[in-house]
């Protein structure tokens, strides 16, 4: 058998490349000095630099919209408190220059919890997995948070109208 098989070398290289890319994509970075703008946007220090972060795959009511202030308070509940370690998993940079990704409070997936508790919508336009839609169905069935209002308007609709 030929040890210099180019197909084997290519396969090995692809496996190594995949490992490097995926391990980097899933690395968590610790955030410091967090301030909350609204239910899906925060400012924080990441590696000593102040950044604006947008929570991936979810959308929350705007502050002037019904349930907007409550949504912000939900996020505060998940992020503020003694001994909470807040981490961030980067996905991309958006057109406004914000870092987009997932927040974790310890092991808790904050983006998921925001939807599950009825504090956010699964953002149909950007959601990549079904888990947020399952969480949203749970919140709707149990009339949690914004789902107490049967006529709740998704933020992307509200923004177009206002």
What kind of region is each of these model predictions?
Residues 2-162:
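Small beta-barrel nucleic-acid-binding modules, primarily SNase/OB-fold domains
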């Amino acid at each position: 058998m030929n040890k210099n098989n180019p197909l084997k070398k290519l396969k090995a290289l692809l496996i190594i490349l995949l490992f490097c890319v995926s391990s980097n994509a899933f690395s968590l970075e610790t955030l410091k000095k967090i301030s909350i703008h609204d239910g899906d946007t925060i400012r924080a220090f990441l590696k000593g630099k102040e950044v604006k972060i947008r929570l991936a795959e979810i959308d929350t009511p705007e502050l002037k919209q019904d349930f907007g202030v409550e949504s912000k308070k939900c996020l505060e509940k998940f992020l503020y408190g003694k001994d909470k370690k807040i981490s961030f998993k980067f996905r991309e940079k958006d057109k406004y220059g914000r870092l987009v990704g997932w927040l974790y409070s310890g092991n808790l997936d904050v983006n998921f919890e925001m939807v599950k508790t009825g504090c956010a919508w699964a953002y149909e336009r950007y959601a990549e997995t079904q888990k947020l839609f399952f969480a949203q169905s749970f919140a709707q069935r149990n009339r949690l948070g914004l789902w107490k209002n049967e006529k709740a308007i998704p933020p992307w609709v509200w923004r177009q109208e206002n």
